[in-house]
């Protein structure tokens, strides 16, 4: 079995943060549109009171940038 690369770790973290947002939106009865997901992630990333790992921050920024290009 090969060791996961940094890209693999980033991709898994991106999937985790997007999945979390989508499930939370579903629980609130909201439709998870890509522009709304990006907005939720921007707001969460701007919250300085929550400590995040460097990987989580990078994943959130990468997802925001990818969704902004859509």
From Swiss-Prot:
Disulfide bond positions: none
Keywords carried by this UniProt record: Lyase
Any Pfam family the entry gives: DUF2767
GO terms for MF: fumarate hydratase activity
TM annotation in the entry: none
EC number: 4.2.1.2
Catalytic activity: (S)-malate = fumarate + H2O
Function: In vitro catalyzes the addition of water to fumarate, forming malate. Cannot catalyze the reverse reaction. Cannot use the cis-isomer maleate as substrate.
Membership in a protein family: Belongs to the FumD family.
Protein name: Fumarase D
């Amino acid at each position: 079995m090969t060791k996961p690369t940094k890209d693999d770790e980033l991709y898994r973290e991106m999937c985790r943060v997007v999945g979390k947002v989508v499930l939370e939106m579903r629980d609130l009865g909201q439709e998870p549109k890509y522009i709304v997901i990006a907005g939720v992630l921007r707001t969460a990333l701007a919250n300085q009171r929550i400590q995040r790992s460097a990987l989580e921050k990078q994943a959130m920024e990468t997802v925001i940038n990818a969704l902004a290009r859509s």
